[in-house]
Design a protein with these regions (language model features):
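N-terminal Rossmann-like NAD(P) cofactor-binding subdomain of oxidoreductases
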Residues: 2-202
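Short, intrinsically disordered, charge-balanced linker/junction segments flanking boundaries
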Residues: 206-211
């Protein structure tokens, strides 16, 4: 009898737009086991934001919470609110991958806190300095040699959109130079109304601006 492959244990640090969307995707995938979520908000707020999404609509499954656990379609996920990754129980939870989508930890030194806490690998969902690799699916994901521990950046949304096109152009025609423009939906970094901000471009109303 062939044994089923061991599920990959995944923990989330950050439960904003990226974190919630990834949990929506992975919660029903039998290859993965979501073992923890660490974020600033309380578990009841996490349950509400996960269930009701203004962009993607209401989650079709069951969502509830009990004590410090988020329960999604019968999966009980322990929740934490710890500021420093080094204090998270990744070793006890046997975490294979931490997905860090906080946007706060953007260099290898800071992200290594997850490894110190017991995680085997870290994927950061933003550009990051000095990491083991920056991988863009469809461009260079097969070029990376897996190590015992890995801290990998998934690059940025603009990079992910642009580099597959550049790869085709470079391979078939060559590129001497170029310029590009991104039209981006507004994010948490912009205010709905004009307000003070160190970056005056971000001080203007997001709904009235082309980001």
């Amino acid at each position: 009898m062939v044994e089923k492959p061991k599920k990959i244990n995944i923990a989330f640090n950050g439960f904003g737009r990226i974190g919630r969307n990834l949990v929506r995707k992975l919660i029903s995938d039998d290859r993965y086991n979501i073992v923890a979520i660490n974020a600033r908000t309380t578990v009841n707020v996490r349950a509400h934001l996960f269930k009701y999404d203004s962009v993607h609509g209401m989650f079709a499954g069951d969502v509830s919470f009990e004590l410090d656990n988020l329960i999604i379609d019968g999966h009980t996920i322990p929740n934490f609110s710890r500021k420093m990754p080094a204090r998270l129980p990744w070793k006890e939870l046997e975490v294979d991958f931490v997905i860090d989508s906080t946007g706060k930890f953007t260099n290898k030194h800071d992200l290594e806190q997850h490894i110190e806490a017991g995680a085997k690998n870290v994927i950061v969902t933003s550009p990051a300095k000095d990491v083991d690799a920056t991988l863009v699916y469809g461009v260079n994901e097969t070029s990376y040699k897996v190590q015992e521990t890995n801290i990998i950046s998934a690059s940025s949304c603009t990079t992910t959109c642009l580099t597959p096109i550049l790869k085709v152009l470079l391979k078939n025609y060559g590129i001497k130079q170029g310029t590009m423009t991104t039209v981006h939906s507004f994010t948490m970094g912009q205010a709905l109304l004009d307000s003070s901000h160190p970056d005056l471009r971000r001080a203007r109303s997001a709904t009235m601006s082309i980001i």
